[in-house]
């Protein structure tokens, strides 16, 4: 019998996510240990504590899960952890702050699936607008969509400065171009007129696009909404919709929070299982989540 799997869950916040704890246990992990209030400067020592305390042949039976609410910080922590390791003491690392990496990946993969059903292969060249882009899910969803070839605009309702820094950060890290827009004083109609794909990543229970906003669209194809709490983030999108026509824009289809969540759940479960069963240490970020999401969503053609 192999050594029990130990998952060390770190977060800069006051508590780790109960959602992530439940996911880890349901994926079969024996021991889950939370560490709160962790700063990036502490990650190297924590990683080396975790890897040096096990026989090298059991190093791969040890994992580090990085939570929090800040994507850039989680990616920095992931980088520090990976650089702290060397053979044969390598442990696995999985970054998914606030579930943002797996949720954003599931969202974009579900949109790609909906586009395929409409006869469109991928996001390349499409006008993609992210509403609620100030949040961690919205930023990563925009980044993934840009990497997939979309012409992405991060839309803020608090001034363009609320998303400009994020756009510049992701541009430096990944070489993508993310445009920014502000709707705090209007302008949604002009944006929606050219929108082909909308990713609604607003706060729970907040409607970011009304029926009137949708009616302004002239070439809209797919709208995805991660808000599962009434009222809907996008008027007319039901939580279980997976390609249902929009009442205010019948030529476009909607994808609801539960349809996205179904893919997100499977992606996170899959990656947690891979940490345990591969036999070698792995490191997962949003790009690995996207690879898994495309495979999982593709099975639902």
Model-derived features: positions:
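Adenosine-phosphate binding glycine-rich loop
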Residues: 2-3, 229-301
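N-terminal ligand-binding/catalytic initiation module
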Residues: 1-89, 287-301
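Gly/Ser/Thr-rich loops at beta-strand to alpha-helix junctions
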Residues: 14, 69-73, 99-103, 133-138, ...
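Conserved active-site and cofactor/substrate-binding residues in soluble primary-metabolism enzymes
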Residues: 38-41, 72-76, 102, 106, ...
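Rossmann-like adenosine-cofactor binding region
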Residues: 176-254
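A glycine-rich, Thr/Ser-enriched phosphate-binding loop motif common to dinucleotide/cofactor-binding enzymes
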Residues: 95-113
């Amino acid at each position: 019998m192999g050594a029990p799997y130990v998952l060390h869950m770190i977060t800069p916040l006051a508590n780790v996510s109960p959602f992530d704890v439940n996911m880890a246990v349901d994926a079969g992990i024996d021991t889950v240990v939370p560490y709160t209030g962790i700063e990036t400067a502490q990650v190297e020592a924590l990683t080396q504590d975790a890897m040096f305390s096990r026989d090298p042949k059991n190093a791969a039976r040890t994992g580090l899960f990085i939570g929090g609410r800040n994507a850039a910080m989680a990616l920095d922590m992931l980088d520090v952890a990976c650089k702290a390791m060397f053979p044969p003491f390598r442990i696995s690392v999985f970054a998914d702050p606030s579930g943002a990496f797996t949720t954003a990946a599931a969202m974009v993969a579900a949109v790609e699936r909906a586009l395929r059903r409409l006869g469109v292969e991928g996001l390349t060249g499409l006008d993609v607008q992210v509403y609620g882009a100030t949040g961690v899910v919205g930023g990563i969803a925009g980044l993934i969509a840009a990497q997939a070839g979309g012409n992405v605009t991060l839309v803020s309702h608090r001034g363009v400065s609320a998303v400009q820094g994020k756009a510049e950060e992701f541009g430096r890290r990944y070489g993508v171009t993310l445009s920014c827009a502000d709707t705090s004083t209007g302008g949604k109609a002009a944006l929606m007129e050219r929108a082909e794909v909308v990713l609604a990543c607003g706060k729970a229970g907040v409607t970011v696009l009304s029926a009137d906003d949708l009616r302004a669209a002239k070439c809209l194809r797919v709208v995805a909404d991660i808000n599962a709490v009434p009222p809907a983030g996008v008027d007319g999108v039901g939580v279980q919709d997976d390609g249902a026509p929009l009442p205010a824009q019948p030529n476009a289809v909607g994808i609801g929070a539960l349809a996205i969540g179904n893919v997100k759940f499977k992606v996170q479960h899959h990656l947690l299982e891979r940490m345990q069963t591969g036999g070698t240490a792995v490191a997962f970020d949003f790009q690995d989540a996207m690879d898994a999401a495309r495979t999982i969503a593709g099975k639902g053609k």
